[in-house]
Amino acid sequence: MPPGGSGQGGCPRRPPALAGPLPPPPPPPPLPLLLGLLLLLGAAEGARVSSSLSTTHHVHHFHSKHGTVPIAINRMPFLTRSGHAGTTYIFGKGGALITYTWPPNDRPSTRMDRLAVGFSTHQRSAVLVRVDSASGLGDYLQLHIDQGTVGVIFNVGTDDITIDEPNAIVSDGKYHVVRFTRSGGNATLQVDSWPVNERYPAGNFDNERLAIARQRIPYRLGRVVDEWLLDKGRQLTIFNSQAAIKIGGRDQGRPFQGQVSGLYYNGLKVLALAAESDPNVRTEGHLRLVGEGPSVLLSAETTATTLLADMATTIMETTTTMATTTTRRGRSPTMRDSTTQNTDDLLVASAECPSDDEDLEECEPSTGGELILPIITEDSLDPPPVATRSPFVPPPPTFYPFLTGVGATQDTLPPPAARRPSSGGPCQAERDDSDCEEPVEASGFASGEVFDSSLPPTDDEDFYTTFPLVTDRTTLLSPRKPAPRPNLRTDGATGAPGVLLAPSAPAPNLPAGKMNHRDPLQPLLENPPLGPGVPTAFEPRRPPPLRPGVTSVPGFPRLPTANPTGPGERGPPGAVEVIRESSSTTGMVVGIVAAAALCILILLYAMYKYRNRDEGSYQVDQSRNYISNSAQSNGAVVKEKAPAAPKTPSKAKKNKDKEYYV
C-alpha cells in the first residue's frame, strides 16, 4: 500500500509523532488580579462622580455568580440623578400650594434650621418654600428662584439676611438639589455639587466679645446694656414660634411650576405627610402626586436599593454613613434628625416665649403643649441604690404601679387647693379611663415650685406656706391602662437626684415650664423607714378605713394632712406628687432661731457693759470733787493758792504742811 493511502477501511494514516513533549497551554489570569482590576475600575467610577461635599467613599458589596466584589459607592450620584428622590409632587400652570401648619401648642422656636429639597423647573422667578412664624413676630425663611438662580432670605428679628448661588442656573429643566442650613444669623447654601456658600453677618462677630464683657457688667445694668445693643443692631439668633411651612409660592404671588421632590425641613418630610393625608397638611390648586422612590437625602443607617447603570440585572444594597451633624458644613440632616429633633437645635417645643430673644415682647404664651423631660427612665427590675421602703396602697379593684423618688416627707405633699373632692368629678369608676388621665409633669429646668392653673396666684404669701423649698420637682404619671403589679421595683433616675421615674405610657403634651394639676392628688405613703441601700418594694393592700397616712420621720411630730374628701373617704386615683425629703428646711428654721437668740444675748451683754462703764466714770468724778472740797476748808489758802487747786492731793498736803510751819 503506498504511503499516504488508506488502509483498513480507508482511514488516513496518522502523521509520525514529533520528538519531545508539547508546550502546556497558557494559565488563566489569577482571580486576585481580576478582583483588583474590578476594584480599581469601581473606585475610578466613584471618584469621577464625587463632589466637594463627599470626602469619604464607602465600600459596599454586590453578589454575583463570580463571587463578592467590593465597589466604592459615593452618595452624590443619587442626589444628582434625575430620578424621583422621595415623594414627588407636580405643580401645574395654575399654581398650587401645600401648607403644613404646626398645632398652636407645638410651635417650635429654633436656633438652627436645615432645609433640603430637590426640584426641576423652567421658571426663572418663583417661590419654592416659605416658613413663617406666628402672627406679630415677623420671623420668616424663604427659598426662591430669582433670575434663574437659587437664593434664600430669612429674618430672625433684626434684618433681612440673604444668601444665593449666582453660578448655578436651575431654570434649565434639569433636576437640582438645594441644601440650606442656618445657625443664628449665619447661613450656608449649596446647589448640587457646587461649592458651599457661607454667609456671616457683621453683627455676629461681636457676640463673643459681648459674652466676655457681660461677665463684668453688673446685674442691675444688664437689661440696659441689652437694650442699647439692640438699638445698635445686634443680630438675633432664634426663629421664634414657627407656625407654617408653605410650598409652591401661590400665596406670595410667584407660583412655582414644575416638580418638587423629598422636601425636608428640620426633620419634617412635608411632602410625605401630604401624600399620607396628614391632618396638619392642606393642599390646594393644580397639584398631582407622582410617587415615591429613593430618598433625596441618603442618611445614616438607611439602605437604598437602586439599579446599577452597567449591570441592569444586579441589585446592590448601598448604605451611606455620615459623621456627626456638626463636623461638616452644608450637608443635609440625617434620619435621626427626621425622627427626633436635636436638643441643641430645638429650643422650645411649644408656643412659649423664649427668654433669650428680644423680639418676643408681643408673644403671648398659650396653654398646653409638650414638655421635654431630659431625665426620665422606664420601669426596671433593678433596685435603686438609695430608696425608701413604703407599702403600696392601691385603689380597689385594680392595682396601680406606684413609683417613688428618693425620700418623701409630710411637708412635701400638695396643698389642699391641689386636690378636689371626688363627688361630681370626671374620674368615676364607671367613666372611661381616657377622661381621667391628666398627669402631673416633672421639669428639670424649673426652680422646683409646683404650678397649677386651679391654684391661687403665685404672688400670694399664704400660697407658699404649704410648699417646701426644694431643688427638683418630681411627679408621677398615672397609667392609661393599669395592670396588676403586686411587686414592682424601680430603677433610680440617672440624672439629678429626686427626679421621678415615669411609666412608658404616653402622656399628653403640655408646654415647657407649665404644670397641670387636674386630678386630685392623694398621698399614698404611710410611715416608711428611712435608710440607705434599702430597695423599694411594693405590696398590694386595701386602703385604710380612716384618712390616708403620710410619710413621717422618727423624731418629728406628725402633722395633720389636708384631706378635702373628709376622713374615711378617698379621691379617685390620679397623679401623685412625691418630692424628696428636705431636712434643710428644719435646720434652717432652727439656725435662724438660734442666731436670733444669740444676737439678743450679745445685745444685752453689750448694754450691761456700757452701763457699768458709765457708773465707774461717775465715781471718778466724785473723788475729784471730794479732793477739791477738802482743799477748800481753809479759806485763806484757797485765795492764795487758787491756781494750785487742780494739782494732786499729795502736792496740796505738802503745801499745807509748809504753810503750817511758816
UniProtKB/Swiss-Prot annotation:
Membrane topology: Single-pass type I membrane protein
Keyword Glycoprotein on entry: yes
Ranges where the record places region Disordered: 1-27, 408-458, 476-496, 530-557, 629-662
Keyword terms: Calcium, Cell adhesion, Cell membrane, Cell projection, Glycoprotein, Heparan sulfate, Membrane, Metal-binding, Proteoglycan, Repeat, Signal, Synapse, Transmembrane, Transmembrane helix
A GO cellular-component term linked to this record: cell projection
Highest rank taxon of the organism: Eukaryota
TM annotation in the entry: 587-607
Protein name: Neurexin-2-beta
UniProt source species: Rattus norvegicus (Rat)
